[in-house]
Amino acid sequence: MISDFNNQEITLEDLEQNNVKLKEGKAKVQFLMRFSLVFSNIFTHIFLFLLIIVSGLFFGLRYTYYNYKIDLITNVYKIKPSIPKLKEIYKEVLEVVDEVKRETDKNSEDSLINKIDEIRGIVKEVTNIAKEFDEKSKEVKPKVEKVIQEGKQVTSNLDKITKEIQALQVNGNGLASRVRRSLTGDINTITNLANNIDFDFNSVKESIEKITGLAQQISKEGKSITKNVEEIKNEVEYFTGKSKEPLKDIDKIKQIYDKKIPIFEKNNKKLQEIWNKLMGIYNEFTVKETKKDYYNYVIYILLFLIIDSLILLVITYMSMISKTIKKLLLFYIFGLLSFNPIVWASIIISLFSRPIKNRKNKFY
């Protein structure tokens, strides 16, 4: 038997039982406090993550409000009716995209991308012919100019021949008249005819020689013209034959355009209709004028809760390492300010550990 601090006699067995009860109570206190701290720490992480997401959302809403005048909060009731419209627009966009994908599919022979390669080949062939024609035209051009020049010369010579023939006709008519008059006259007239006829014959002979010379020159120039014209003709026939296929291919290009352009015109018209529908939905959520501090109060509250949650995380980590009354009081204060129901529940649980009564134990 021994006496305690109150001079009451107790046995060693009573002391041992009392010591066991104290240890069990202390273990229970430590468990409740540790559980409340861990529990609040975990859900503060989750709550902080949600706060960051919501804050990002509100910052986005604030940005669209001030930059695009879109007010989703006031017009939130319009979101649900707009969803079916957006789904319909989405289907229409998919139809346009599918059609465009078909036209850009390299595995499809009828796709526009393959037709473009075909058009590129045709254009290259036509370009090569044009280049060849340009090179040949440089060779043909002097021949054409020569034909024109020789043609002018032939025309000039023909005019000269015409004049000589006219002169020959005049001389011949004059000679015939004198002969007729002389045959009906006397001997003196015949004598004069003999004297003049030599001159007339010389004039006729000279005209005939000129005509003969000009005719030979015309014949020579005609052969040259014929030769050059034949060469020009051959070149023209060469290019005429060579251009038949490219000309058919150009018709093929026209057919491709006639077939494919309506598709893109239709899609362009459809995209314009889709855009008009989207703008109609967009206009339903816009406001004429923005208010200065419309979203600020929400942003301030969210920032306060984020800062409070960060401080609460630091306090819970520190309290799990070393629990003191000061840390627990801070835990209670910032836990209440967190507006987190689960943290409030953790605070209530921690109160069962009677932290004020057990403050001397420091909850180790």
Swiss-Prot record:
Keyword terms of this UniProt record: Membrane, Transmembrane, Transmembrane helix
Compartments, as annotated in UniProt: Membrane
Membrane topology: Multi-pass membrane protein
Keyword Transmembrane helix tagged: yes
Coiled-coil parts of chain: none
Superkingdom in the source lineage: Bacteria
Primary location group: membrane
TM annotation in the entry: 41-61, 298-318, 329-349
GO CC terms: membrane
Protein name: Uncharacterized protein MCAP_0005
Origin species: Mycoplasma capricolum subsp. capricolum (strain California kid / ATCC 27343 / NCTC 10154)
